[in-house]
Amino acid sequence: MLRIPHLNLSIILKESVMIKEVSQKQVPSYLRARRSKLSRYLARTALRILGWEVSGNIPDEEIIVVVAAPHTSNWDFIIGMLTILALNVNLKWVGKSSIFKPGFKWLFKWLGGIPVDRNNPSSLMEDVKDIVAREKGFIIGMAPEGSRKKVIRWKTGFLRIAELTQAKILFFAIDAPSKCILIGDIFKPTGNVEEDLKFVKNYFSAFKGINPDQF
């Protein structure tokens, strides 16, 4: 039986305001990307103008699967990409192949995007194997809801990837009321998909998305 942690959200959010500037210091050196200082500066500036902060640090783990939720708005993608740039983290993220259109494909791939064909999801596993084999540190991010709309059943691909790579799962919570991206707890899956999925969903139930009625 998994124990669901009790989150004292008031303490978490009180601590989050202590971080005024997003920095690559929140990321272990071997998990950082090779992006320019200008791109990082522009991303930090954009987050500051929008009023968003990033609290917490990415742990010193060689392989990490990031789970981001609640996903209820198109703004989640924009804020997420700005966060990746501002942290200068070498994070790969999974997106449906239809968004990788000409004109955007190069940008999304530069930002770490991996297109996945929903009719052939097994191809993602091959991509992950290739990346893990050639890179020292590997982080892949996914939104298990798979949609901005309210869904009952979350997708379990993140658990399969964690099992394939023997990775731990790191929670990225999007909390709209506080305008904070919280880099939260790290979780080692048990191998019981239903119990693990229940644990993850309960963790994120403490947070509210931009459109809370869709979560």
Regions found by a protein language model. Give the residues of each.
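Membrane-anchoring hydrophobic helices of lipid-metabolizing enzymes
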Residues: L13-V65, A69, I78-M81, K105, ...
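Non-catalytic C-terminal accessory region of glycerolipid acyltransferases
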Residues: K14-R34, L38, P121-F215
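Residues at structural and domain junctions
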Residues: R3, P28-R32, V66, V94, ...
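Short glycine/serine/threonine/alanine-rich loop segments
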Residues: W52, V89, G113, Q166-A167
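N-terminal amphipathic/basic-hydrophobic helices that include classical n-h-c signal peptides
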Residues: M1-V17
